[in-house]
Amino acid sequence: MKVGIIGAMEEEVTLLRDKIENRQTLSRAGCEIYTGQLNGIDVALLKSGIGKVSAAMGTTLLLEHCQPDIVINTGSAGGLASSLKVGDIVVSTEVRYHDADVTAFGYEPGQMAGCPAAFIADLKLIELAESCIKQLDLNAVRGLICSGDAFINGAAPLARIRTTFPSVAAVEMEAAAIGHVCYLFKTPFVVVRAISDVADQESHLSFDEFLVVAAKQSTLMIEAMLTSLAKRG
């Protein structure tokens, strides 16, 4: 089995990259893909860059060049579920765009024309993530993750997202694009991110302060998931 792992930022991939054995690097169009072995599993770790376009382009390169069997999106997210705090884990059941609007043509809010309203995460990967969460004794929420090309920082955008997507657990800037590409390639995926901030008027300050905490927690999760996959053979 080969596992594709995607993080947007240097801080979100550096801890994993440094542990990859027999590491090789592919640089293409602003993306970097690191291949090798981690915790007994063949991996291809993508640093995509921030935002939906970078994430979609990088995921396409990853799937075309490395052909992973599954994809895990790691990194940080802004928590919207009331029980989430910095360092907690959010696991996607589905991902949606919060900034797409073609409702004039009969589509749901967040649904891109010609596409499903949501991109559904793989149930077996969700269960794998949750078994690792239990093993590591972490606090976590399973739910909807919404993506858009904006850092959510303030009452108005937060209220809009919560009103439009009442079940949203977290927001960030890449997961829906990654899920979209995986859907087109028919590649199972899941998003497993750690909370770096609670999306409010001070979230930019929290993000800067706690990104490292979130990166450590999400890395811990990825390593646990890889170890579990290796044991399963």
From Swiss-Prot:
One GO CC annotation: cytosol
UniProt-listed Pfam families: PNP_UDP_1 (PF01048)
Record-linked InterPro entries: MTA_SAH_Nsdase, Nucleoside_phosphorylase_d, Nucleoside_phosphorylase_sf
EC top class, as a word: hydrolase
Family designation: Belongs to the PNP/UDP phosphorylase family. MtnN subfamily.
Biological function: Catalyzes the irreversible cleavage of the glycosidic bond in both 5'-methylthioadenosine (MTA) and S-adenosylhomocysteine (SAH/AdoHcy) to adenine and the corresponding thioribose, 5'-methylthioribose and S-ribosylhomocysteine, respectively. Also cleaves 5'-deoxyadenosine, a toxic by-product of radical S-adenosylmethionine (SAM) enzymes, into 5-deoxyribose and adenine. Thus, is required for in vivo function of the radical SAM enzymes biotin synthase and lipoic acid synthase, that are inhibited by 5'-deoxyadenosine accumulation.
Self-association state and partner proteins as the record states: Homodimer.
Official protein name in the record: 5'-methylthioadenosine/S-adenosylhomocysteine nucleosidase
Organism: Yersinia enterocolitica serotype O:8 / biotype 1B (strain NCTC 13174 / 8081)
